[in-house]
UniProtKB/Swiss-Prot annotation:
Protein name: 5-dehydro-2-deoxygluconokinase
Organism of origin: Halalkalibacterium halodurans (strain ATCC BAA-125 / DSM 18197 / FERM 7344 / JCM 9153 / C-125)
Spans traversing the lipid bilayer: none
Domain of life: Bacteria
Reaction catalysis annotation: 5-dehydro-2-deoxy-D-gluconate + ATP = 6-phospho-5-dehydro-2-deoxy-D-gluconate + ADP + H(+)
Pathway: Polyol metabolism; myo-inositol degradation into acetyl-CoA; acetyl-CoA from myo-inositol: step 5/7
Length: 331
């Protein structure tokens, strides 16, 4: 089954949310306290997704706010360099800084992130800075969960969703749950459920859907889709790590995609690369089952490399991994 989208739009995908800096440890297999060297990359889930999408050949744009500093200029320059439209990337004029994420790679199984997110520019995007004429030029609007964690970014995202719905732009909600961004799980559940119920496509891990539903124990996919299909969503993708991912349609179809074998260097970046390749396949008319394969293959490639944004693969790399058909089979 394919997913129907408008064909008369200039952009395939526009994302709204955070763009920040990732500083990834160059020295592997050691704790942060002993790490001396880091490499700088563009980070932030929605930024990574549009970068990955653009590298795959989609026409992608970005709505967000960056700091008026060296890091902000690096973000804008890098995004432009890979083909992302930055005409709606606003430069902060109130002294807010770029968010920083330092990553620690103790082992493939033990990676952590140290975040600096106090008064960051991306959370100060205001509703007045969201342009309806820009949104209506796209097939999809991608919303990231972290952008809902604080005002005025929260209201800017809610406005963008309203404008998308008014202009027949499909809304994709990438849950992107970061607990350090929120006051309480209950607050997260309120805003996640509000946005999920208005979205057309919802993508996240099983654990992120549990947060959306305010569960304290692992939830059930069938219960999740019963709840969400009472509202706007037409397609729900639930990721289960090495067990693969599952896609469900409101029409009743269900699909499973398996994870691909790879040599894991680190665990972060998988979700963003998954989303960019999954959406690429959907937009290209390849069908939902094939889109699951593209998402899984892209994630497997990125976790084997040092960065997230810079490691986003090409179509040829993804298709080569799919062709090898070396999947992880877990019942």
């Amino acid at each position: 089954m394919t997913y129907e989208l408008s064909t008369d739009r200039e952009f395939d995908l526009i994302a709204i949310g955070r763009a920040c800096i990732d500083l990834n440890a160059v020295e592997y297999n050691r704790p942060m306290e002993e790490t001396m060297t880091f490499s700088k990359y563009v980070g932030g889930s929605p930024a990574n997704i549009v970068i990955g999408s653009s590298k795959l050949g989609l026409k992608a744009g970005f709505i967000g706010k960056i700091a008026d500093d060296q890091h902000g200029r690096f973000i804008e320059s890098y995004m432009r360099g890979v083909g992302v439209d930055t005409s709606n990337l606003v430069v902060d004029q109130e002294g807010h800084k770029t968010g920083l994420a330092f990553t620690e790679i103790k082992s493939p199984e033990e990676c952590s992130i140290l975040m600096y997110r106090q008064d960051v520019a991306d959370l100060y995007l205001s509703p007045e800075e969201v342009n309806e004429a820009y949104i209506r030029r796209s097939k999809l609007l991608l919303v990231s969960g972290t952008a809902l964690s604080k005002s005025p970014s929260r209201e800017a995202v809610l406005k963008a969703i309203r404008l998308a719905k008014r202009n027949d732009v499909k809304v994709v909600f990438e849950l992107d749950y970061r607990p350090y961004s929120w006051e309480t799980p209950e607050e997260t559940a309120v805003y996640y459920s509000l946005v999920a119920e208005q979205s057309d496509i919802v993508i996240g891990t099983r654990e992120e859907f549990d947060v959306l539903e305010n569960r304290t124990e692992k939830g059930d996919n069938d219960e999740t889709i019963r709840y969400l299909f009472k509202h706007s969503p037409e397609l729900i993708v639930i990721k289960h790590g090495v067990e693969g991912s599952f896609a469900y349609t409101k029409a009743g179809e269900a699909y499973r995609g398996y994870a691909y074998k790879t040599k894991v260097l680190k665990t972060f970046g998988a979700g963003d690369s998954y989303a960019s390749a999954f959406l690429y396949a959907l937009i290209s008319g390849k069908g939902i089952e094939t889109a699951l394969k593209y998402g899984s293959a892209s994630a497997s490639i990125v976790v084997s490399k040092h960065s997230s944004s810079d490691a986003m693969p090409s179509v040829e790399e993804i298709e080569a991994l799919i062709e090898k058909d070396e999947t992880i089979t877990i019942a």
